[in-house]
Amino acid sequence: MKSLLREMTDTDLQRCLEKIRNKQYTFIAAGDNGKVYQIDGEDKVFKITGDRDEYEIAEILVDRANEFTTFIPVYYVDGNNMYIVANADTLPAGLKKEIDMFMDDFAFFSRDEGGEVSIFDFLPDAGELNPQIENFLTALQTDIEKLGVSEFDLDFDFRSDNIMMLNGKMVMVDW
């Protein structure tokens, strides 16, 4: 049953693509490199990104939600700059605050280490973390290693604004 929730049928995909072609969507957010739109009447959104590296990661993730559980499920990539993903919920304020504090501490750690360190290098020195955040970071590290993208752990955009909730679990929605 879990895998069915993470998959998208061809019929669902075609319906979403038709709605995108017919401009049946609503703008919901913009970030540094792109814009996100809610597809009318669907629990899916699509993103148009100007960041080639971000798009290349989406290409790796497409139809692999069961393998990469810490990333938002990617259902479709268009071969250019658009991809369709699940619609997720906002990160609760308490988790957002704890992740922001973790990142503030990481910034000090990074400076002390002279840069070129990842959040995973910091994890053993982070002190006591919320178990939900610690478990997410451990699983995220495993997923990033499975991606096989050289130095992605140093380059990905880990911050609370890029994490949302899907089915009660944290997922990266931007990277």
Q: Regions from the language model: what does each represent?
A:
Residues 148, 152-175:
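Catalytic activation segment of kinase domains across protein kinase-like and atypical kinase folds
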Residues 54-56, 92-96, 167:
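Short catalytic/ligand-binding loop motif for oxyanion handling, primarily in non-cytosolic enzymes
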Residues 68-138:
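Conserved structural core of kinase catalytic domains
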Residues 24-83:
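ATP-binding glycine-rich loop module of kinase domains
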Residues 132-157:
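ATP/nucleotide-binding catalytic cores
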Residues 48-50, 86-87, 174-175:
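Residue-level recognition of conserved beta-strand positions in structured domain cores
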